Regions:
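Surface-exposed, short loops/turns at beta-strand junctions within beta-sandwich domains
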Residues: 125, 132-139
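Short beta-strand segments within Ig-like beta-sandwich modules, predominantly Fibronectin type-III
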Residues: 119-125
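Transition segment at domain starts
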Residues: 25-74
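Mature extracytoplasmic domains of secretory-pathway proteins
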Residues: 53-116
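C-terminal motif of bacterial Sec signal peptides marking the signal peptidase cleavage site
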Residues: 16-17
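Short acidic/polar inter-strand loop motif in beta-rich domains
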Residues: 148-156
Length: 165
């Protein structure tokens, strides 16, 4: 009798999407953006997760200042005329049966003062996103925010580039 009750409870949990085997880290790995140069699609720009709201858990990881970031990171060199492409999953699998949709993506430039300046992202027909780099040479740090399921799931990443002459 107890076995039947246990099997029934586990079955209900699986069917309702409350899988005992749900793995937040595995689910969030699906959100890691692929960031490349339009002129050189094989050149990847590394993004680091800085925080998330996932399945009711909220974590704000350390977001370095631009000065700390530039000191510690090796940046990809980019031409002033290049564009950067961002590719993310439009649907993320949650547990065994549920998928959540990407419904917002925002990009901000992190200024030396620590303030954020919104950057226009353009969505292309093939599902990729693009943005143009600043015309002034220098090192730039960005924060990318992805929102899924009307903001129930959010993940932030930071990355940087160096604009050359």
């Amino acid at each position: 009798m107890m076995k039947k009750i246990a099997v029934a409870i586990l079955s209900l949990m699986l069917l309702s999407g409350c899988s005992l085997f749900s793995d937040e880290e595995k689910e969030m790995k699906q959100t890691i953006p692929e960031i490349t140069l339009k002129s050189s699609p094989n050149t990847e720009i590394k993004a680091t997760r800085s925080g998330f709201t996932w399945l009711g858990a909220t974590t704000k990881a350390y977001l370095p200042t631009p000065q700390e970031f530039f000191k510690d990171e090796k940046l990809v060199r980019v031409s002033k005329t290049d564009q950067i492409r961002v590719v993310t999953e439009n649907k993320v699998r949650m547990g065994l049966f549920k998928k959540v949709d990407l419904d917002s993506m925002q990009l901000a430039l992190v200024l030396d003062s620590g303030e954020f300046e919104q950057v226009a992202l353009t969505e292309r027909d093939d599902g990729r996103w693009e943005f143009s780099v600043p015309q002034k040479s220098g090192k730039y740090m960005y924060v990318l925010d992805e929102g899924y399921q009307n903001g129930d799931y959010e993940v932030s990443y930071y990355f940087g580039v160096e604009i050359s002459e």
